[in-house]
Amino acid sequence: VNKVPDADKGNLQDRVDALTPAQVPDVTDANGNGKADTAEQAEARVFYEKAFSNVYQTGDLYAKTDTTSMFAPAATKLAKSTAQWTTILEKNAGAQMSQDQNAGGETRYIYNGSSGSDVITVGESFGGTGLNMAAARNDMKVMTGDGDDIIITGRDYGRLASSGQWDYKYLTEMGDGNDTLIVGASNSNLNVILFNDGSIGAVNKDNSQFGDVIPFDSAYDTSYGGQISGTTIDMGSGNDTVLALGYESGGTAIINATIKLGAGNDTIQIYGDVKGGSSPSVITGDAGMDTLIITNGSVFSEHFSGFEKIELGSKGEVKIVAKDLVGNDSNVIEGGVLKITGNSDSKVDLDGEWIKGETWNEGDITYTSYTHESAPGISVLIDDKITQII
């Protein structure tokens, strides 16, 4: 450049100044993971549409020892006892069935997932929630392994608590990865929508404008159901999502169940009540920034731990006892702050003597802080739009 004559340098600068800069579109990364939201949404749509539009097992999904093949080779007997899983095994290349015994000495059948992303889709129920005590189905363990796995049922998941089946069976372990569990896809009052960052959530059908609707196949449109009951679910590490969509008429969505979300920034969305059985239902957020969303139902603090945010939808209610917020190990509230958002028909019941403190502004939300001597170092911040605080 220094060798260019001075007279030409001026002309060169004029030409550079006249250039029109290239227009580069803004790239948004709402969750800060280094990937553009548009790319995440496109990948998520392909992933979810595959599961939403294909029901691999149209009836119930279960295993039952085949008594007609008692003297057949072990492989034949196993195949007949797990015949309901045939299509799912075909669709998840590399997945296999095996068997062992549970703690009670009963035969238990095991789904061993593929090395990739498993897709298990069921038109009706997984397990035996629709059965009475006289109907025999074997215990099961579902291990999807690592990968971004998804399980969807049109109806229920687990065992029928109302028939006295209080012992936990049908253990589910989804392994490492960003996994998804949807129970109650047949709830015709709701749409599942895809947000810009690739995450999903459920909304009432008149609110579907807040995201892109991903429709369920009509094979999920089965009879009454939508409850998680009598089972243990471990979502594993990763940013996991659980949608417990409940019954169309409302009522209990989770009863007598343990749901462990694992390390990661997880979300569980519940339509209906959370109740205990012979022991409280337990939903743990574990390490990470975790969110519990409840609509048209209530949850008590004895049923959850390790959550940093609670979103109360329409007619959503949470009752908090201070000592329940003091977690152990991975179930502490990260940062010692629990934020609760909602609206005028949401309700927060603070049990005991809470001290009302300062207000905090975060975006368009104004919070009021509450503390209790039984939960030292923990602040509960409640959205001022929630007017029912008792």
Where are these regions (language model features)?
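Low-complexity acidic/polar repeat-biased segments
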Residues: 346-390
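Solenoid scaffold repeats with emphasis on beta-solenoid/beta-helix
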Residues: 86-87, 108-109, 118-120, 140, ...
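Beta-rich interaction/scaffold domains
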Residues: 1-59, 72-74
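N-terminal segments that cap or nucleate solenoid repeat domains
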Residues: 57-64, 69-73, 77-151, 205-224, ...
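Glycine-centered beta-turn/loop sites at beta-strand termini
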Residues: 112-113, 122, 144, 153, ...
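Conserved consensus positions within extracellular tandem repeat modules
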Residues: 104, 116, 125, 136-138, ...
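Extracellular beta-strand repeat scaffolds in secreted/surface proteins
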Residues: 46, 57, 65, 69, ...
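Short linear proline/tyrosine/threonine-rich motifs used for host-factor recruitment
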Residues: 28, 36-38, 99, 109, ...
